[in-house]
């Protein structure tokens, strides 16, 4: 049974994307198609803020791209030595909040201690942050231009100061249309399609509708999280399942429950 995941590939130690591995255990043949590209912005401003941890109460990361922006700042501005010598430890003396295991892993790789990774989405992370003692200093929140309002609003309502800054913007992947066309020609109609973000849905849906034709209604549509579910509902797309958390295991469990493949894990 063939399933389509609209995301880019991330290799683990085995050289395979963990989502493909997990779905294979369930007897599902998964294909990944990237639908998003990212352009970084405001890096000099971010670099300046990273140099002054004393001005902030901590950090918030809700996407891997925001962590990549920090890594780029360290590399481009020759700050790696200063980061290793003192900046990293000064940030670690504060709270570094993250959503999801993928983001937490990248945060750990730049030497920071992540907390809140098990939250799974921005709303749950906001609840976690609100449950902790807060500083009078703002939390620094590097994010994309298309960020949800849930986390900032919840923190504001609780009187927790936060300074968000746009460090990347999301654009359509240049190969979306061609990759989807090739997939449909080679593999046919997938049993399910998983959307990993509202932006991914926005940039790919019209191509999927055109390529699927009269078979569109046969496809089971899956969301990686609540914000994607809301975006799908706004488009009138039936949501067969929302993963309980943005992890390979949770997504595989959701797809397995919807499709009930043979030889399932």
Swiss-Prot record:
Record flagged with keyword Cytoplasm: yes
Cellular location(s): Cytoplasm, Cytosol
Catalytic activity from the UniProt record: hydroxymethylbilane = uroporphyrinogen III + H2O
Pathway linked to the protein: Porphyrin-containing compound metabolism; protoporphyrin-IX biosynthesis; coproporphyrinogen-III from 5-aminolevulinate: step 3/4
GO cellular component: a single term: cytosol
EC number: 4.2.1.75
Subunit: Monomer.
Protein name: Uroporphyrinogen-III synthase
Natural source organism: Mus musculus
Gene this protein is translated from: Uros
């Amino acid at each position: 049974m063939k399933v389509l995941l609209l995301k880019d590939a991330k290799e683990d130690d085995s050289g395979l994307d963990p989502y493909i591995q997990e779905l294979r255990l369930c007897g599902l043949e998964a294909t990944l198609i990237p639908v998003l590209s990212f352009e970084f912005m405001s890096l000099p401003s971010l670099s300046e803020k990273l140099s002054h941890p004393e001005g902030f109460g901590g950090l918030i990361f809700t996407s891997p791209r925001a962590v990549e922006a920090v890594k780029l700042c360290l590399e481009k501005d020759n700050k790696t030595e200063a980061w290793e010598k003192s900046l990293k430890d000064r940030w670690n003396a504060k709270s570094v909040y993250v959503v999801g295991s993928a983001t937490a892993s990248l945060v750990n790789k730049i030497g920071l201690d992540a907390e809140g990774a098990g939250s799974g989405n921005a709303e749950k992370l906001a609840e976690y942050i609100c449950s902790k003692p807060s500083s009078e200093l703002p939390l620094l929140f590097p994010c994309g231009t298309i960020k949800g309002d849930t986390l900032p609003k919840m923190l504001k309502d609780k009187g927790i100061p936060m300074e968000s800054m746009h460090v990347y913007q999301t654009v359509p992947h240049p190969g979306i249309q061609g990759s989807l066309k090739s997939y449909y020609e080679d593999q046919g109609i997938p049993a399910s399609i998983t959307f990993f973000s509202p932006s991914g849905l926005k940039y790919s849906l019209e191509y999927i509708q055109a390529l699927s034709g009269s078979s569109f209604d046969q496809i089971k549509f899956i969301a990686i999280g609540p914000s994607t579910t809301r975006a799908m509902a706004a488009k009138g797309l039936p949501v067969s399942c929302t993963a309980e958390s943005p992890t390979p295991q949770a997504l595989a469990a959701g797809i397995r429950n919807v499709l009930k493949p043979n030889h399932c894990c």
